[in-house]
């Protein structure tokens, strides 16, 4: 429907007909099939005034409740906070815990939501300050520790702000880089490991299918505040870029989290550009809509902490609430 417009020339239905909609008559307008219409007041007391409309609506609702005992089912909404410990018992066991990670619940079914790294090996997370990016990485770390052994998964954490310090205290933690100097020192050994997993000319087709020419854990590189790592002066993680397309073969998973502000420009940075080209998992949390579309068809918007739109090949786009776990 289309109500009275300030300028009939703005009508999407019929400009001439829009000129005939009287001014000062609330509820008058036109329909898409070019008919005049009048919207009725939402009251049942035969009063044609909008005075005390709120009270009249409440009285009408009370009257209807008295006539019938039936009630409409309550609309289930995403909670503003869900504890990771409370969510764990609801999650089904996975036969590939090193590739399927529980992170929260979705809006459609209010059911546990998993990141499917077996289908899409990498992930990008966008969100502004205090939106829950670090909370998501913390939940991922704790879920990996809960469901896997150090022989199945090794974590390489890049955390310049030290917000993930102490989250992983088991042998799952391979390296913890808290500064650029530390990261520069650790990357060469990581690159050598990945290089050793690349299939050589003597690898058979059967070995390629089974991924049996090497053995070892899946490697997860979790990077918080990626905008502090990838600077104009250089990016210590840049050597990883050439291995990203081979991630399923060599057991590599890169998860980067950065602020939404400035992300539209940062998408041209080599590593982020390659991850986007490879159709990685994406989570768009709270951010300024002026940044434009960064993941799928999702435009940033204001969201409560922990809330975001998850973009995955298997599940399309869905709103989720990330499970919260205490920093300590």
Task: Give, region by region, the residue ranges found by the protein language model.
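P-loop NTPase catalytic phosphate-binding loop
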Residues: 1-2, 6, 94-280, 287
